[in-house]
Amino acid sequence: MSSSSETRRLRVGVDVGGTNTDGVVLDPSRASEPDRGIIAWHKAPTTTNPSLGINDAITTMFQSANIEPDHVASVTIGTTHFVNAVVERDVARLSKVAVLRLCGPFSKHIPPCIDWPEDMREIILGHYALLKGGLEVDGSLISDVDEGEIREQCAIIRDKGIRSVVINGVFSPIDTAERQEERAADIIRAAIPGCDVVCSKDVANLGFLERENAAILNASILLFARKTIRSFQEPIRKLGLHCPVFITQNDGTILSGDMAAKLPIRTFSSGPTNSMRGAAFLMQNQLDEDIMVVDIGGTTTDVGLLLANGFPRQQAAYSDLAGIRMNFSCPDIKSIGLGGGSIVRDGESMTVGPDSVGYKLTQEAVVFGGKTLTATDCTSLADQGVQIGNRKLVEGALSEEGIAKFKSIVKRKLEKVIDTMKTSPEDVPVLLVGGGAVIAPDELQGASKVLKPRWSGVANAIGAATARVSAVVDTVKSTEAKMTKELLDETSQEAIEKTIAAGASKESVKVVEMDTLPLTYIENKTRFIVRAAGDFDFSRTDLSTTLIEEAGAEAEQKMDEYEKSGKSNTTRRHNELVEDIDIEAYKPSVKNRVWYISETDLEWISIGCYILGTGGGGSPYSGTIRLREALRKGAVVRVVSPADVPDDAAVGCGGGAGSPTVGIEKLAGDEMLDAQRELYKVCPTPATHMIAIEIGGYNGLQSMIIGASSEMDLPVVDGDWMGRAYPTKWQTTPVVYAERAVIWAPVAVADGGGNVLVMPRASSDRQVERIVRAALAQMGSSVAVADAPVTGAECRRWAVEHTISQSWRIGRAVARARRDNRVDGVAETILAECGGAEAGRVLWKGKVVGVERTLRMGHVYGELVVEGADVVDHDDQQQQQQPEAVTSSSSSSGDRKPKFRGLLKIPFKNENLAAIRISRSKDADGKIVEKEEEVLGLVPDLVSVIDAQNGEAIGTPEYRYGLLVIVLGITASDRWTSERGIEIGGPKGFGMDHLTYKPLGKFVKPTSVIDEFDVSV
């Protein structure tokens, strides 16, 4: 029997946590009333079979408020089951995974899970193999998949008893023609019937390692997720509810059950997201500032920043879960193993968590007659006002000293995680929600006030009930007859319509994410990805009520096999157990003017390299973990000052050339050493030292990789030929000095796939570039280049000095800003390491609202558009340094907060070329007309875009809609500011003859780490 839309108005939200199952029924039409329209709520321990808890919650609420099933418009279920399995490292719920890479000869130095915490790698990674396959960036084949090779691996996987397989192909997200991952999946399913196969392209986008990581986690949780979601849906059918059933996903929107069963990773952050959305619902009309939401459950505490607009703060370009780096957007949530069910171990060194009794709290906690001392027991013992269970049962379990120690540990854990999530040192309001909030103290350092609103214990269920609707359009369109922007607008409208069709109200839908990926191997074709979101339309009665795989007995899932295994390793190497390095006390190892690189040095240098890369040069991340592994295996990397290089030294050079987009997707093989070996077959003088071609990006580390004792074993010069990153070989300081007719010949080029190009001589450096670039287009748009050595005397005259030191100092500045929770001032901290106010300034702060890219002859061309956002700088002096055209003063007396308003355009050719403030208006025909208002920064000065959430650089391949960014301008080295230097590396070198270079400030030479820290013996 159907009901009218007026009758069917109620929304049911259920959140199945690791400890409690919470439910709420609310009437959204009464949301503004004092009771927020909450008709009924329920909290009960989570059962091993979640269907029993869901059934109990809904039945109890329906009975208490006399609710009929036909009154319900939707049921939305959220869960922390999956993320808890990962956080707890529960081997009973995490399946072993086999990883098959379709990569040909590439990525061999960076195997799967190399950057994972050691314990997670041991639990999940069961097998991996590097197989034929993969695409180049232009869609051509690295190699085709080999069915026989895949079948051989299937036999090994089958013998190991592994039932989950991940396929990760190079450039698979743009593979619309070869369908390599899909073809491999078909072969695997035929060879291993009944196994789960995850194609990486279905999980995340470009970014080989990060996509692979996400796919592996997704595969590991797949079996458990499928059975769990079926168990969620079963009680809905039994209760006679004929309404849509949704699962909440990471961004606070809803997902159909069948999609959630295939991509459970999209729900990993749904629990804390629900709590934050629920908090926003409870605090509506009271939220006029950012609030830190602390959701304390039975197993974990999840902390996130709820912005004044009611939405959670999003993570940076890369996300992190349990120490695993991924590349899909989700709320910026920090989870720690602390909850009401956390196990307390008393002793000389008391521990609280991270393991938990979870949903068995009412059976195993001492206050309920159990034998396991939990955080709830200790809280009951410490506070007589807490009425939970039988307090007498826990008396004597801890001494007064033990109680004080417990309270101190809990307080310290909460304060630390709150501190970590802050971006400024100012106190922020803290909102406590969740069933475990009872263990939290009433006061916390760093909190301006601690709030606990009514119904906060079921905020997660409220968030589920009020979850939004979203939809994605991912399509390829022809750009032959229409401009990219016009097609993007069309795709956005399609996404809006799809979101409305999925159940959103028309007036609430907005585009929340968009991306364009030119498919240059298909002429005039571009891939458009647009996501829109909106509020649920309660008047809809036409939405599907189908549940996934209603397979009778199979749907009656036995969940007993997922009882807490007890095998999670509490002595594991876990991020929260690792002591932070004392940044101020740390001193690099410099002995007799030789700097021996450590892991800490490498991390800081890597951060600095990417910032100096001005958007290009490729991400140093893969090079960082490759070199880190070499250091851990005993390799030695030596850095020396240019001043200490003998006149007759032979300073060699090597690095990558090509598109930075390729660098994050096609990981290196042996091409760098191949090129060096081929060079010295035609070059009579062997290198005695190495120097980086460019400090910016991936190439900033290449001299250290090549020079490591495990490779060529050569000292590395603290400098480079650019002081940044540039897209061409002739845009280097040796060419600026022009002391030789040709610098860059002989030269050797290798693509890692067996192809080598050697030029013993050339007519000019520009000709070297043209020939290498022409070959590059046929060699995968990314190659390794080995350059003939120069003399030590030439090196001292030409090199931009101390740029490894500069990178190290920039990285240290970012690390310090994070430690001090001054990420809001990280830009100024970076500038201080680059010479201070006279050497650079903050050009812009805001949100990315537009990205356009195209690929031509191995270069990525495009532009980034950033919409200005109001910015508060705490340093009055820094306020005075902002360009007048960018800032404006408030009319109120004494209010001098700078404002970034309007639009900033950053054109790029691999690297950012300029920062230009623009205005847009419509002409008489309604077409948008763009006007350049002011050039704020221009090559050869550095224009760097950094992530406002963590202070790290964002490269041109990572630009995407919605990112919050800071744009830095840093004055170029004086090696570039001569007339010839500006001609080569300035606007004219990029065809921007209409622009005139005006230096941002005065160049300040970087301070040498070797000079500062040397200990001579």
Language-model region placement:
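N-terminally biased helix-coil "hinge/interface" segments that flank
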Residues: S2-I611, G617-D674, G696-Q702, W721-M722, ...
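Short acidic, glycine/Ser/Thr-rich loop/turn "cap" segments at secondary-structure junctions
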Residues: N213-A215, P686-I691
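Short, surface-exposed loop and linker segments with low hydrophobicity and enrichment for Pro/Ser/Thr
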Residues: G271, Y521-E523, M690, G955-R960
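Helix-rich "cap/lid" substructures immediately adjacent to catalytic or cofactor-binding pockets
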Residues: L673-P684
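Internal, conserved structured core segments that host functional sites
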Residues: A692-S710
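Conserved nucleotide-sugar donor-interacting segment of glycosyltransferase catalytic cores
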Residues: D713-V716
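ATP/nucleoside-binding phosphotransfer catalytic cores, i.e., glycine-rich phosphate-binding loops
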Residues: G836-D876, P883-V1017
